[in-house]
Swiss-Prot record:
GO terms for biological process: photosynthesis. Chlorophyll a' binds at residue 676. It is an enzyme of class 1 (oxidoreductase). The chain crosses the membrane at residues 71-94, 157-180, 196-220, 292-310, 347-370, 386-412, 434-456, 532-550, 590-611, 665-687, 725-745. This is Photosystem I P700 chlorophyll a apoprotein A1. It comes from Zea mays. The gene is psaA.
Length: 751
């Protein structure tokens, strides 16, 4: 770290009017790419390439500054779409929903924000969600977020929707402006210290601070009134709380003292709205809103400090290059030397790192949404709980595969082996054979042993020998490490965390269950032999996914089979004619194969979650305090055999979607059917080769010529890689939509 203050330097960071705005240029298909613009637009292949390469900025130009500007501009377009989407969500809440009714009775009324038009009899889909409202039950969690943020009327949702539209148009304008009018120079994109300072202090610091401010001044008082049963129409409007301190002081007396306790360090005065309670609010079943406000204030302070750590114009603070180059251990050669150059000149390397982090974070979010439900009445809305978990797991899986994809693109396009010697990346590449062969051994070990435990149980069960099965009732395989972690956390309050009154999550154990309106919100989750078995399946599928993706990255440039692989590019079908056995070796193919195993991994996780929660957590509680779970605790006995998974999970729980015809859930029945079809359609692309289709196309074209109806654009069979891409897309889309229909029909019917 350097501490010396010199005169601040002023740099010119933008070019004015670098590229003129031309509608004629935009109208020319493929104008952005040399290859496509020169190509032959008379074939369907050209159309496919147009779509495949439209966003592959590397293939349009080799100029890093131009690529950076395109990416930057595209980000604004992406933000515009996000604002447009959000606006649509809020508009639906304002125009087509029962939000105000739900707000008055969230335990008995389901959230709905979509009403189907009465055409061809499809109004059957508008089921009764309670309170006399007929519509489609939604499971996105928007109602819960809106209540937590203090929205009390549909008018407020309208205003927010209009605001989001204004922001969407602003983002579109910014995307055009920062490409055509004031485009940043390459140096601006590479100024990582400035970027870190602004992102940490601005986005995360001030963002969290403003959210904390909103929660304290608007959300908390409004939620206080709602929890007390005050009619939403009687509650003062948000701006009244902000402008009139006396209103807040009536709810939180310390507000009357203003900032005095802050400056006199008498901070405990603020504990009534910046609390540290832990656990769940017994009225709403969500985390305490005052805990959440406290959390965002603390996070804001951390990030505001972090955003002042890096050296920019004033010659004081950390430099990223120095930190990375100092990062060497006794056994790691040059360590991170050269990493700074990689991350400031290869956006693929940068993106890969960010996708890996974001993907992991997204999966962590999935697990926190049920174990620490952040919004009021979220925990008892089982459909939303299941949807949020499933959604965040899928998103996390895709992001992690994306991380491997861009790591491989970096290796092929941006990695320069001549300048890298003995740094960490080089050392990993030099012992890649050891890494991959060991990982392969681990996959084989995990696969045979985890599956073997199930097969043993199926065999013993089939032969009528329950006493010889691995189960909680016979040969126990208790997950002792997981139980140990649970116990540590359950016992933490008063021992390792003396300030806390309760553990971070009820799932650890130790606490009483929380029930809202006769429904279980959360209770301690027991783990047993069944969980031990399925967790080893998780370990197996995750390790295989990693094996495929990591092999793709480490062998992206070369292998014993194809030493010059880097020259063939990121995606290629085979190493040319005359070299048999070299197909499916490109880095792209590893991403393709990795996607299937990612799908396997996430499927097992969401199946496990869905069944475990229905069996051991979700359910109703009687006046006598007796809990009745949805599937009556059958997970521990049934999920220990493959047959049990098929019979008591897939088949038994599919009854709702299969029998949905003629009811308001029938759309899920149709989706279940249609998505199976989309999935099966993918196999047509995955199981047949290019030549088969070219032959077929030629005879179809002959017939068209005979009838003089041949198109001007020549049809061509998909290339091998395009066929695989279309195949994996439909495979995943069909599989995910099938699961979605199965889960939602089930949980809406029984939850």
């Amino acid at each position: 770290m350097i501490i010396r203050s010199s005169e601040p330097e002023v740099k010119i960071a933008v070019d004015r009017d670098p590229i003129k705005t031309s509608f004629e240029e935009w109208a020319r298909p493929g104008h952005f790419s040399r290859t496509i613009a020169k190509g032959n637009p008379d074939t369907t292949t050209w159309i496919w390439n147009l779509h495949a390469d439209a966003h592959d900025f590397d293939s349009h130009t080799g100029d890093l500054e131009e690529i950076s500007r395109k990416v930057f501009s595209a980000h604004f377009g992406q933000l515009s779409i996000i604002f447009l989407w959000l606006s649509g969500m809020y508009f639906h809440g304002a125009r087509f929903s029962n939000y105000e009714a739900w707000l008055s009775d969230p335990t008995h009324i389901g959230p709905s924000a979509q009403v189907v038009w009465p055409i061809v009899g499809q109004e059957i889909l508008n089921g009764d969600v309670g309170g006399g409202f007929r519509g489609i039950q939604i499971t996105s969690g928007f109602f819960q977020i809106w209540r937590a943020s203090g929205i009390t009327s549909e008018l407020q949702l309208y205003c927010t929707a209009i605001g989001a539209l204004i922001f969407a148009s602003l983002m579109l304008f910014a995307g055009w402006f920062h490409y055509h009018k004031a485009a940043p120079k390459l140096a601006w994109f590479q100024d990582v210290e400035s970027m870190l300072n602004h992102h940490l202090a601005g986005l995360l610091g001030l963002g969290s601070l403003s959210w904390a401010g909103h929660q304290i001044h608007v959300s908390l008082p409004i939620n206080q009134f709602l929890d007390a049963g005050v009619d939403p129409k009687e509650i003062p409007l948000p701006h009244e709380f902000i402008l009139n301190r006396d209103l807040l002081a009536q709810l939180y007396p310390s507000f009357a003292e203003g900032a005095t306790p802050f400056f006199t360090l008498n901070w405990s005065k603020y504990a009534e709205f910046l609390s540290f309670r832990g656990g769940l609010d017994p009225i709403t079943g969500g985390l305490w809103l005052s805990d959440i406000a406290h959390h965002h204030l603390a996070i804001a302070i951390l990030f505001l400090i972090a955003g002042h750590m890096y050296r920019t114009n004033w010659g004081i603070g950390h430099g990223l290059k120095d930190i990375l180059e100092a990062h060497k251990g006794p056994f790691t050669g040059q360590g991170h030397k050269g990493l700074y150059e990689i991350l400031t000149t290869s956006w693929h390397a940068q993106l890969s790192l960010n996708l890996a982090m974001l993907g992991s974070t997204t999966i962590v979010v999935a697990h926190h949404m049920y174990s620490m439900p952040p919004y009021p009445y979220l925990a008892t809305d089982y459909g939303t709980q299941l949807s949020l978990f499933t959604h965040h797991m899928w998103i996390g899986g895709f992001l992690i595969v994306g991380a491997a994809a861009h790591a491989a693109i970096f290796m092929v396009r941006d990695y320069d082996p001549t300048t890298r010697y003995n740094d960490l990346l080089d050392r990993v590449l030099r012992h890649r054979d050891a890494i991959i062969s060991h990982l392969n051994w681990v996959c084989i070990f995990l696969g045979f042993h985890s599956f073997g435990l199930y097969i043993h149980n199926d065999t013993m069960s089939a032969l009528g020998r329950p006493q010889d099965m691995f189960s909680d009732a016979a040969i126990q395989l208790q997950p002792i490490f997981a139980q140990w972690i649970q116990n540590i956390h359950a016992g933490a309050p008063g021992v390792t965390a003396p300030g806390a009154t309760t553990s971070t999550s009820l799932t650890w154990g130790g606490g009483e269950l929380v029930a809202i309106g006769g429904k279980v919100a959360l209770l301690p989750i027991p783990l047993g032999t069944a969980d031990f078995l399925v967790h080893h399946i998780h370990a197996f599928t995750i390790h295989v996914t990693v094996l495929i993706l990591l092999k793709g990255v480490l062998f992206a440039r070369s292998s014993r089979l194809i030493p010059d692989k880097a020259n063939l590019g990121f995606r290629f079908p085979c190493d040319g004619p005359g070299r048999g056995g070299t197909c499916q070796v490109s880095a792209w193919d590893h991403v393709f194969l990795g996607l299937f195993w990612m799908y396997n991994s996430i499927s097992v996780v969401i199946f496990h979650f869905s069944w475990k929660m229905q069996s051991d957590v979700w359910g109703t509680i009687s006046d006598q305090g007796i809990v009745t779970h949805i599937t009556g605790g059958n997970f521990a006995q049934s999920s220990i055999t493959i047959n049990g998974w098929l019979r008591d999970f897939l088949w038994a729980q599919a009854s709702q979607v299969i029998q949905s015809y003629g009811s308001s859930l029938s759309a899920y029945g149709l989706f279940f059917l249609g998505a199976h079809f989309v999935w099966a359609f993918s196999l047509m692309f995955l199981f047949s080769g290019r030549g088969y289709w070219q032959e077929l196309i030629e005879s179809i074209v002959w017939a068209h010529n005979k009838l003089k109806v041949a198109p001007a654009t020549q049809p061509r069979a998909l290339s091998i890689i395009q066929g695989r891409a279309v195949g994996v897309t439909h495979y995943l889309l069909g599989g995910i939509a099938t699961t979605w229909a199965f889960f939602l029909a089930r949980i809406i019917a029984v939850g």
